[in-house]
Amino acid sequence: MYRLHLERKNDMKYLKVIFDDKSRYNYQYKIDEVNIANNFNKDAKNPKDMGGFNFSNEENILRWLHNGNYIYDVIIPNDTTVISIKECATPGGVFRSNKIIVTNKRKVTDDMAFEYYKKTKIPESAFPKALCAVSLMNYKNTALNILKDKVNEDNIDFYIEEWNDFMNKKDRNNSNDTVILINNELHKIKELE
């Protein structure tokens, strides 16, 4: 990890995905106001010890869409410490800060998820978990496109391993029709091997 002062470059949009206005850890966000982290240790190695607020950008948000059903634009207040997380699934696409403003709430749709897929620059190794994320959120068209574009006989074992790792947590395997469909399609590809 390294300390980074964020400046908007080339109209880069910073984004945060949240369930309505609460994080998955029950933090209640104030919309259009400065949110200040109760805990932030920029030198911590473990994300839980670091605290703060995570956010991403348009090029990497696809991987993190399972973190909520609404997407917000992120504004970084001037006196904010921001860390770019290099040791993660999307290096250069996950940031953590002690302060954040979330604004411009939009419900994430399958069409939006597909647009993020078309813009994404996540590494190939992050696509299996991105497939899991969009499947879990029931973005069927996006999931089917990732499956069609990315999964093949050469990488099917890796996709199934990552799928099982993600979906076996919290018994997500039967979460919705898209999860069931993609799971079945992955196993059909495996059978072709």
Sequence positions of predicted segments:
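ADP-ribose/NAD+-binding catalytic cleft of ART/PARP-like enzymes
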Residues: 2-50, 66, 186-193
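Short, flexible beta-strand-to-coil junctions
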Residues: 17-23, 74-79, 136-138
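Active-site-proximal loop/hinge segments that shape catalytic or ion-binding/gating pockets
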Residues: 87-148
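Charged, long alpha-helical assembly modules
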Residues: 147-193
